């Protein structure tokens, strides 16, 4: 076994941190995504110089974040389609894209020599696409894939990917590290000129830059709020990783609202992968949203002083108008519900006060009965009584009871039939004890009725038995009287002795019959109890009787054996007696399985097994003797091997030939 796997163990270098599959061209170890012909591009070198300057101003933590982001979402673009369409108008140069100060990094220049080995086994190799990257403070780098009409058609027809609407935020490489929104760039096919749109986007970015205020806290943002579907990368089937966001607490995050001059794309505008929108980007606005945004802009101008007092209002107005409308509607509904709850609480308090006053004044002793039956309320005092308004409930004796919200007081002074009263704890305890007593009475009543039925049955049976006994006694008496002679009767009458009365005879017979029936019933009850106490026939074990062991019928009886008591302890039979029946049964099952003997024939075959064991012991002793005679040395202890027996047989044949 070790020799068979020795080669694989010796050539497996993965234990040393290096894989022997790295040299294979299909192992994904290449990080050069672009062709080498593009290295001489002057715009490319300018971008590399700009990236180097930006990287010099970053900290070690920011550089590690960028490296982790690139390692997690590496994607490339179809280079063949790019070569076939070099003059594609949808590809904008870096200087024309809004927010061009973002980092579009090349993995070859971003990663050093030390990080190449770490990236080999984490990233698959793609031979048809090129990707550029944007850094974010969320540690979630979304690729900005350059689109083409064929690529958009390919992604629109792909059934395995959701609509490619990325929600990632670009990171401004300023000292404060502010968060900005990348305004989505529409395609030229939608009727907007890229140059005009870029000019408008530059103007809007200048107008939207707001200086950071120290008093205003960063608003709470929810990533992917308007995209319920998960974000999937376009070239790989793996979803993007969402890491924690600890840096947002130490940075001033500013949200930019879209002004009225911002060109709204048409309703059928397809969202491509090149539109890098922030995690709280503005959705496509309708006419209602524009009206709400105008109202918000007016409210901003009117409530400038209020924002200095309450900093959270500014954060709410910076949110999208649809979200602001939802928040305002929720606030209005919450306020209305709170007002309704307050009014309902006041009504409940008034009703409870009136109810407690009436119950305490009119029937304080029957509180439990009135509360337990809310459908039959007590009578109220007439409205003309003066004590009705003056008296108040005693808080020490009666606790405040709460009534359900459906309880309404009618004008005629009566309760609503559907009203339900929450009973105080003391009254609940009393009711629970009363219920327990009632249940006990009910149980006793059932037992009493059952006993009465049994008594009636016994009476009926006793009456039937009395009738039968009376008839039999009558027949016996008549037969006896007929057998006697008339002379005896005459002598008895003449002597003046009176015959026993018939009623006395019947009473004696009835008592005897009752005693006999009671004895029969007692015997039946005893038999029933025995049947219940004795186990079922299926659970009773079958007892096997065998002949006792003696010195004559024991195995190897030709030898002088010890006494039965010594044999008992020599064989360890006391351990079997100490075991329970389950353990003994398991041992017997194991023996039957090892010997391959059914239980039905086990008593008859146990002698045969004994003889086979005895014969095997004799043959073993004979083999040991032959071995000593041939080789003049003792055989090793244990089972005799086939090879040893064959050698012994061969040696015996040789000796026989020599003797002949």
From Swiss-Prot:
Comp. bias intervals (Polar residues): 125-138, 156-176, 222-243, 459-480, 488-497
InterPro entries, per database record: Sid4-like
Pfam families found in the cross-reference section: SID (PF11778)
Subcellular location(s) per record: Cytoplasm, Cytoskeleton, Microtubule organizing center, Spindle pole body
Compositional bias annotation for Basic and acidic residues: 384-396
Highest taxon of the lineage: Eukaryota
Sequence segments annotated as region (Disordered): 79-243, 368-396, 459-503
Keyword Cell division: yes
GO cellular component term of the entry, any: meiotic spindle pole
Residues that span the membrane, as ranges: none
One of the GO biological process terms: negative regulation of septation initiation signaling
An annotated Gene Ontology molecular function: signaling adaptor activity
Keywords recorded for this protein, A-Z: Cell cycle, Cell division, Cytoplasm, Cytoskeleton, Mitosis
Subunit structure: Homodimer. Interacts with cdc11, sad1, plo1 and dma1.
Task of the protein: Required for activation of the spg1 GTPase signaling cascade which leads to the initiation of septation and the subsequent termination of mitosis. May act as a scaffold at the spindle pole body to which other components of the spg1 signaling cascade attach.
Protein's UniProt name: Septation initiation protein sid4
Species: Schizosaccharomyces pombe (strain 972 / ATCC 24843) (Fission yeast)
């Amino acid at each position: 076994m070790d020799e068979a796997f020795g080669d694989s163990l010796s050539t497996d270098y993965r234990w040393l941190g290096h894989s022997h599959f790295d040299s294979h061209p299909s192992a994904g170890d290449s990080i050069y995504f672009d062709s080498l012909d593009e290295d001489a591009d002057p715009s490319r070198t300018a971008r590399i110089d700009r990236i180097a300057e930006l990287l010099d101003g970053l900290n070690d933590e920011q550089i590690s974040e960028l490296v982790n982001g690139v390692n997690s979402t590496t994607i490339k673009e179809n280079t063949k389609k790019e070569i076939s369409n070099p003059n594609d108008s949808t590809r904008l140069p870096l200087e024309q894209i809004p927010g061009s100060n973002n980092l579009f990094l090349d993995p070859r220049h971003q990663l050093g020599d030390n990080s190449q080995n770490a990236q080999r086994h984490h990233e698959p190799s793609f031979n048809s696409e090129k990707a550029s990257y944007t850094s974010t403070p969320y540690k979630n780098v979304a690729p900005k894939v350059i689109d083409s009409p064929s690529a958009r058609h390919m992604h629109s027809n792909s059934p395995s990917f959701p609509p490619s609407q990325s929600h990632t935020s670009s990171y401004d490489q300023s000292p404060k590290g502010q968060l900005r929104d990348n305004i989505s760039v529409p395609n030229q096919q939608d009727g907007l000129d890229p140059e005009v749109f870029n000019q408008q986007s530059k103007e809007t970015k200048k107008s939207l830059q707001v200086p950071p205020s120290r008093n205003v806290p960063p608003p709470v943002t929810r990533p992917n709020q308007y995209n319920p579907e998960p974000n999937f990368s376009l070239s790989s089937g793996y979803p993007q990783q969402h890491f924690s966001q600890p840096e947002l607490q130490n940075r001033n995050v500013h949200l930019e609202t879209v002004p009225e001059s911002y060109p709204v794309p048409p309703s059928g505008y397809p969202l491509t992968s090149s539109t890098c929108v922030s995690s709280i980007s503005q959705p496509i606005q309708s006419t209602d949203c524009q009206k709400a945004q105008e109202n918000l802009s007016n409210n901003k101008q009117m409530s400038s002083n209020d924002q200095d007092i309450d900093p959270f209002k500014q954060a709410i107005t910076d949110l999208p108008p649809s979200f602001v409308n939802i928040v305002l509607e929720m606030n209005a509904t919450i306020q209305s519900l709170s007002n309704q709850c307050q009014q309902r609480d006041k009504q409940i308090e008034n009703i409870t006060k009136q109810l407690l006053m009436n119950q305490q004044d009119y029937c304080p002793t029957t509180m439990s009965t009135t509360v337990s039956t809310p459908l039959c309320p007590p009578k109220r005092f007439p409205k003309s009584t003066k004590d009705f308004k003056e008296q108040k409930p005693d808080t020490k004796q009666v606790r405040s009871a709460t009534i359900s919200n459906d309880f309404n007081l009618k004008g005629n002074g009566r309760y609503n039939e559907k009203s339900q009263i929450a009973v105080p704890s003391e009254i609940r305890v009393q009711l629970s004890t009363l219920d327990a007593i009632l249940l006990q009475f009910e149980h006793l009543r059932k037992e009493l009725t059952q006993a009465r039925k049994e008594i009636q049955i016994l009476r009926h049976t006793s009456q039937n038995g009395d009738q039968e006994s009376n008839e039999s006694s009558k027949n016996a008496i008549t037969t006896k009287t007929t057998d006697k002679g008339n002379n005896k009767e005459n002598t008895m009458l003449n002597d003046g002795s009176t015959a026993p009365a018939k009623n006395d005879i019947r009473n004696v017979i009835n008592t005897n019959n009752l005693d006999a029936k009671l004895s029969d019933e007692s015997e039946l009850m005893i038999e029933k109890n025995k049947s219940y106490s004795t186990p079922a026939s299926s659970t009773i074990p079958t007892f096997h009787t065998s002949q006792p062991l003696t010195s004559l019928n024991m195995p190897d009886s030709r030898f002088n054996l010890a006494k039965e008591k010594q044999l008992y302890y020599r064989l360890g039979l006391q351990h079997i007696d100490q075991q329970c029946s389950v353990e003994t049964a398991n041992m017997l099952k194991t023996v039957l399985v090892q010997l391959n003997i059914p239980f039905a024939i086990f008593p008859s075959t146990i002698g045969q097994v004994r003889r086979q064991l005895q014969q095997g012991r004799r043959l073993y002793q004979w083999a040991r003797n032959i071995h000593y005679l041939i080789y003049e040395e003792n055989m090793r202890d244990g089972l005799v091997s086939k090879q040893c027996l064959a050698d012994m047989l061969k040696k015996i044949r040789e000796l026989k030939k020599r003797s002949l």
